[in-house]
Amino acid sequence: EAYEYLGMLEQFDMSANGPETADGWALFIEASRLAYADRDHYVGDTDFVDVPVEGLLDRDYLASRAQLINPQQAIAEVSHGTPPGAEDRPEDATDDRPGTSHFVVMDADGDVVSMTTTVESPFGSGRMVGGFFLNNQLTDFSFVARDEEGRLLPNAVQPGKRPRSSMSPTIVLDANGDFELATGSPGGNSIIAYTAKSLVGMLDWGLSPEDAAALPNVVARGDTVNIEEGFDEAIMAELRDRGFTIQGGRGENSGIHIVRELEDGTLIGAADPRRDGIAAQP
């Protein structure tokens, strides 16, 4: 889902609309709303649901979704699109919950791991076996199995099925296939927005990994935009004037971890200041 998000933003000159502008954040918010609408409608366990992955990432489809975005005026009502290969299906009703960790590791040989792991709620199910807490990840299924017409929801509970996840561990390679950066975050369904924020911050806005991780979190899923405390008040007021429904002053639960390699081979690590993470080397 994070890649659909970025694919829409690729249609705009994000480098000219930085984090100090209302236009930059308006573009970010609208791409978020559109990507979440598609994700909530189409995504489920691919062993049970035909997820149109290629269609969701199709360049023409992303361009058509991006055409819905006007940074001067919020989209009145966001709905899912119809990507190539998509089947008609009911609207989903899943409430995702946070309780996750993320780390990025790079060794002396240049091998990189970006890993997100979860037990769902704090301490998972509350039951420990062999020194490990068992997760309660099944709560990531939709609590409603069918819509009013009796159609099975994409994320409904079924035997042997995996619940939908927002985990987005990311590794970015340059045009030559060489490592450039790795990032990711915990945070329930907000993971998608957190990961996208770190990528846009570094790749489009030219921020350091530390500054990209520390950027105020902005999560837009549906009609309400949740903006973290510390966000520029003038930009927030301008976004409201453009029709966005803003819930300001809300603390967010990101835990972004980043490793980036510069052109001279220097490695830079960064950890989200909101959690107990650090950048370290042997």
Kindly give the residue locations of the regions a language model identified.
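Alpha-helical support elements that line or immediately flank enzyme active sites
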Residues: G7-E10, S185-L207
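Internal maturation/activation junctions in enzymes
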Residues: Q11-T118, R127-V129, R250
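Cofactor-centric catalytic regions
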Residues: A74-A76, H80-G81, D88, P98, ...
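Short Pro/Gly-enriched beta-strand edge/turn motifs at strand-loop
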Residues: H80-E91, D147-V157, D241
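Extended C-terminal subregions enriched in glycine
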Residues: D109, G160-P163, T195, D204-G251
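Active-site rim segments in enzyme catalytic domains, especially the processed small/beta chain
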Residues: D111-A175, L181, W205, P209
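A short acidic/small-residue loop/turn micro-motif
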Residues: E120-P122, G187-G188, D223
